[in-house]
């Protein structure tokens, strides 16, 4: 595998098909090693990974730190409450300090959009070699989640050959609080790159019409045979109608902590219309896969029966796949200009 073309991974909007395939290939390789009992390899021995999380996280933070440790990297965690931020230091200065300490990669999560981008610009201006990996920024982007969801769906539809083009023309239903979801935005880039047709479903107040711009604004180099064109995006307010033709469903939670306006009449009404239940799934004649980036709110966007009993509920697969996916991203960043 040659050099990786990106110093930072901030969004999937600049990923080429080759970039996606590099991540998928490495993810599969690392997953196979993990499944074979090889829990640690010396790929990043001597590298320092620093996780800087300004938002609460269970899956993403632990997954990144475990991924780094499985690659034999040194890992340090940043805690805002016990840092110099409490003394007035800026986030930019904190990042520059970690770079000066020799951090090779900063894994950053922040509640505001584009904070990782601004940090990467300051690092580049200072001539630091440190890379930034966006672990989720506001409503903007969550690249690693988009990539692990992409891998999870490809693995489901093409378990042996792992062909990304299997997603071409598949109808992927994304239901829930799309307007506040950085995961949805990353999923749109990744899935439409391989020709998937996306159905965004939810109350009109939670799905902005401008999401259809994601396809038309894609980089030209994302197109490559055997995929003749990017997928489409359509918008629906009916889960019952949308699920009938879906090949897969990605459920999103209601992000009540981000709702600054009264966008819903009531949680009860939302659940009645958009909670994924066995009854709604029965409208589809196929055993379609169900994904959810977590954390889940049982009984609001997805029923416990679907989570616990539905055979193709892939939530735990997503968690498991997150580790090799993030191993792949950390490894690839280490290959930038090497």
Curated annotation (Swiss-Prot):
It is an enzyme of class 2 (transferase). It catalyses: carbamoyl phosphate + L-aspartate = N-carbamoyl-L-aspartate + phosphate + H(+). Its EC number is 2.1.3.2. Carbamoyl phosphate binds at residues 59-60, 109, 142, 145, 294-295. PROSITE patterns: CARBAMOYLTRANSFERASE (PS00097). Keywords: Pyrimidine biosynthesis, Transferase. GO terms for biological process: 'de novo' pyrimidine nucleobase biosynthetic process; 'de novo' UMP biosynthetic process; amino acid metabolic process. Pathway: Pyrimidine metabolism; UMP biosynthesis via de novo pathway; (S)-dihydroorotate from bicarbonate: step 2/3. The keyword Transferase applies. Pfam families: OTCace, OTCace_N. GO terms for cellular component: cytosol. The keyword Ribonucleoprotein does not apply. HAMAP family: Asp_carb_tr. Heterododecamer (2C3:3R2) of six catalytic PyrB chains organized as two trimers (C3), and six regulatory PyrI chains organized as three dimers (R2). Catalyzes the condensation of carbamoyl phosphate and aspartate to form carbamoyl aspartate and inorganic phosphate, the committed step in the de novo pyrimidine nucleotide biosynthesis pathway. Belongs to the aspartate/ornithine carbamoyltransferase superfamily. ATCase family. This is Aspartate carbamoyltransferase catalytic subunit. It comes from Prochlorococcus marinus subsp. pastoris (strain CCMP1986 / NIES-2087 / MED4). The gene is pyrB.
